[in-house]
Structures are given as structure tokens and as C-alpha cells.
Amino acid sequence: MNWLDEINWNADGLVPAIAQDHKTGRVLMMAWMNREALQLTAQENRAIYWSRSRGKLWRKGEESGHVQQLHELRLDCDADVIILMVEQIGGIACHTGRESCFYRVFENGAWKVVEPVLKDPHAIYAEHKHE
């Protein structure tokens, strides 16, 4: 059996993929992968996701420079969630310019921002458009 056949893909042919810092275990982001994205991730040793909004492969860092170098892939007990242990190049995983996409905490009935913006996202994406 092909290793990709062991995954319980959802009805859309996708599986949730959680990126974690390979040293600290901190959750950086969650995205989706289709079969091709997961296969390419394993081949290229970098995170490649499926963009549902754009309907195409999304090589993390292709626009921002914030590539996720793959250290390890893990599959959960139900074979329906992938974890990518990664090195986050540039220290920014979120398109908002933060280290993690999980920068809000629920406090007193509201979501509170608890993580700083490390770099203005307009500056991040403008830099890489001119390269």
C-alpha cells in the first residue's frame, strides 16, 4: 500500500495539516493538504499546502520568503490529521506578520490579541514582489 493511501482524506480529498515548531512544539498554523501537496512536501522537505480559496498548491513562503523547512511528518491515530514539525524560516508563520496564527486568546467573553506583530505584512509581501 502506498503511504498516501493510509490517510483518511475528507470528502474534498483534503486532510488538515498542523505546522509546529520542531524545537519548541509551538503550533504555528493550520492549513489543508491534498494528496499532491503532501507528496511534494515529503519530496521537497518543505511545507506545501492546498489553498482552498485559490484552488491551487501553495508553497509556504513563496510570496513572503517565510518557508517552512520540514523536519518530520506525523499522522494521528485516526489517520485524518497531519502534523508537520518544521523550522520556520524568518520566524513568521502568519500572514499578519506574527510568529503564529494562534495569536488571540479567549478572555472574559472576548478574543484578545496577545502576540505582537513582528513585521508589517505589507512590508513582507512588498519586499518579495520586487525580487
From Swiss-Prot:
Enzyme kind, highest EC tier: hydrolase
Binding site for Mg(2+): 76, 78, 80
Top-rank taxon: Bacteria
Record keywords: Amino-acid biosynthesis, Cytoplasm, Histidine biosynthesis, Hydrolase, Magnesium, Metal-binding, Zinc
Compartment(s) of residence: Cytoplasm
Any one Gene Ontology cellular component term annotated for this protein: cytoplasm
Entry-linked PANTHER family: HISTIDINE BIOSYNTHESIS BIFUNCTIONAL PROTEIN (PTHR42945), HISTIDINE BIOSYNTHESIS BIFUNCTIONAL PROTEIN HIS7 (PTHR42945:SF1)
Subunit composition and interactions: Homodimer.
Protein name in UniProt: Phosphoribosyl-AMP cyclohydrolase
Source organism per UniProt: Stutzerimonas stutzeri (strain A1501) (Pseudomonas stutzeri)
Organism lineage: Bacteria, Pseudomonadati, Pseudomonadota, Gammaproteobacteria, Pseudomonadales
Gene: hisI
